[in-house]
Amino acid sequence: MSKKIMLINAIDPEVSRMAILENGKLLEYNIQMSAKEPITGNIYKAVTLKVERGLQAAFVDYGGKRPGFLPLHDVSPEYYADREGGGERHGGRPTLKPGQEILIQVVREQKNQKGAMLTTYISLPGRYLVLMPNRQSTGVSRKIESDADRKRLMAFMEPVAREEKYGFIIRTAGMHRNKQELSRDYDLLTRLWEGIRE
């Protein structure tokens, strides 16, 4: 009579291992990774928990398992506490206030005991452009090396760059697109951003 044994190792929360032995011989061995949705690039409404001046960073609750890490140099001036009055300046740098609501984007997933790396400088990738709502700078992807192409693309977007308050970068996918296609992508991204802000 054969004797089957199933062994399961689920010590690691990210990986489960299962083996089936029959009479001491391995019949089957399976490894299953936990299905985890990547969150890099996601945008969340968050609350500042604590500002650590020594680290020049804030810890932020964005709904993850542990608070995220937000370096103060990655905080857009629109969130500086002293804009609303009563905020502090430390070492010539404005800081956030605990309890302050902010919009953040995940730059790097949390690893081991470290929380996710965050920024308030949001970037929204579109088909032909990347919208940067917290910045006023405009540009063309470095991968587009031809000066003629770079000038042509910036000429297409010059009226938008003058009128609008949002920065953008024209992606390599936008290289052979016309003014209408680039403007349409820009309009779509600005509507998306305004919807996120509401």
Name each model feature, range by range.
Residues M1-E198:
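Single-stranded RNA-binding surfaces
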